[in-house]
Amino acid sequence: MKEAGQMQNLESARAGRSVSTQTGSMTGQIPRLSKVNLFTLLSLWMELFPAEAQRQKSQKNEEGKHGPLGDNEERTRVSTDKRQVKRTGLVVVKNMKIVGLHCSSEDLHAGQIALIKHGSRLKNCDLYFSRKPCSACLKMIVNAGVNRISYWPADPEISLLTEASSSEDAKLDAKAVERLKSNSRAHVCVLLQPLVCYMVQFVEETSYKCDFIQKITKTLPDANTDFYYECKQERIKEYEMLFLVSNEEMHKQILMTIGLENLCENPYFSNLRQNMKDLILLLATVASSVPNFKHFGFYRSNPEQINEIHNQSLPQEIARHCMVQARLLAYRTEDHKTGVGAVIWAEGKSRSCDGTGAMYFVGCGYNAFPVGSEYADFPHMDDKQKDREIRKFRYIIHAEQNALTFRCQEIKPEERSMIFVTKCPCDECVPLIKGAGIKQIYAGDVDVGKKKADISYMRFGELEGVSKFTWQLNPSGAYGLEQNEPERRENGVLRPVPQKEEQHQDKKLRLGIH
């Protein structure tokens, strides 16, 4: 047992050394999220990728196959199978760079989607799953020659918790997974690292101070300032129910079934559960920083041009989801003052097999110093330093620049491509974004039009040829219709909000949950 714990700690330490920073050796004055934990959190977050439209489409197809009533026995069997197979998020990593963000669809598991999307390019990749993959996925992934498979140590993809799993099929699948694991070259493991000291506190403080929350408080100064904390508590409850096993004995039983019996004894078990809870708290905190807040979202300031496909906004829940991806990336920053994250997605001409629908991942990045540099190679001072020669601004690579540099897909001019940035793009990045052919920018607008000592944000407001969607109240006047006929904008079209969504027990701000 002691050796097992030492091996786990050794594996965690190795992973920490290999992915601690972009530069490989730099340790800043602020806490940073390790790459292992970043990939883990992104896999959990991808499991939550909005799929309402896909479910509606599936329901219509189901009625088309079986008629309005359908074959009850067949529909019951399909429903039972789907309850047993848990939706799963997946992050594909190559050379410590993200090359794919995926989630399960109605028809395919996350691992199967990765095989379809990446094929033989999966060789030597690391895969981070939000649940332990099933044998059907694992056999193909292992066959592709992946390097390492990491998973979240709770209920696996073939659920061991649901009533549907009582047929023993889930246990048989777990045994098959263990046999595949034992006889493959790929390292199948749990990579969870304890968060660095003060990381949770730092994330809480910076999330509340981020552009999106501050825009709400400045726009509505009389509003209840507790809305952010109320939203966070709701998210924590939701994510703990989804990603944790509340009953400790049941959790131990699952761990033993999926081959992690070495983690069932203390202190390993208690440490594991604490690390999992800390990561869920961090995810809920970051997700709450881009809240599903009534009448706030990413809108064009001049919404009159919404006819062309490149000018149409994404559904708000998808835009928020992608912005939270960027917010998570920002906690890998090497800038002591301001963390910025950016993620690029594109939308194909038709829906694909992925749970993300027609959307596919292009690239991502955060602000950092050049790859391979050491901590003392470049200045780290901001504009408070009078000597301009030892300021950081001429040396740091911006998040948008890293996302463009390390993109894994080409940006196609005929498709709608979009970049999500946690802060307004500066004058250095705006022409790069336009020149790359990106059609849409989603960002905060707190700094628009400002000119600071070493960085300015003048070009964003003047940018033409790229649709800009900034975090703001719906400019079409939906907020003023609150007492009459509430509406919300989706894909550039105002749609009525169901009456039941309007009820909110004496709260000045209403927040929703994904």
Curated annotation (Swiss-Prot):
Motif position, Nuclear export signal: 271-283
Main localization (coarse): cytoplasm
Matching CDD domains: deoxycytidylate_deaminase
GO molecular function: cytidine deaminase activity; dCMP deaminase activity; importin-alpha family protein binding; protein homodimerization activity; zinc ion binding
Chain residues that bind Zn(2+) 2: 398, 426, 429
Protein's UniProt keywords contain Lipoprotein: no
Comp. bias (Basic and acidic residues): 59-83, 485-514
Pfam family, one: dCMP_cyt_deam_1
GO cellular component terms attached to this protein's record: cytoplasm; nucleus
Keyword Hydrolase (UniProt): yes
Cofactor(s) listed in the protein's UniProt record: Zn(2+)
Listed Polar residues bias regions: 1-11, 18-27
GO terms classed as biological process: cytidine deamination; DNA cytosine deamination
Enzyme class: hydrolase
List of catalytic residues: 400
Chain spans, region Disordered: 1-27, 55-83, 480-514
Substrates-to-products reaction catalysed: 2'-deoxycytidine + H2O + H(+) = 2'-deoxyuridine + NH4(+); cytidine + H2O + H(+) = uridine + NH4(+)
EC number: 3.5.4.5
Domain spans labelled CMP/dCMP-type deaminase: 70-168, 317-482
PROSITE patterns: CYT_DCMP_DEAMINASES_1 (PS00903), CYT_DCMP_DEAMINASES_2 (PS51747)
Tissue-wise expression: Widely expressed. Expressed at high levels in the testis.
Residues engaged in binding Zn(2+) 1: 109, 134, 137
Family to which this protein belongs: Belongs to the cytidine and deoxycytidylate deaminase family.
Role summary: Catalyzes the deamination of cytidine and deoxycytidine into uridine and deoxyuridine, respectively. May play an important role in testicular development and spermatogenesis.
Protein known as: Cytidine and dCMP deaminase domain-containing protein 1
Organism, scientific name: Homo sapiens
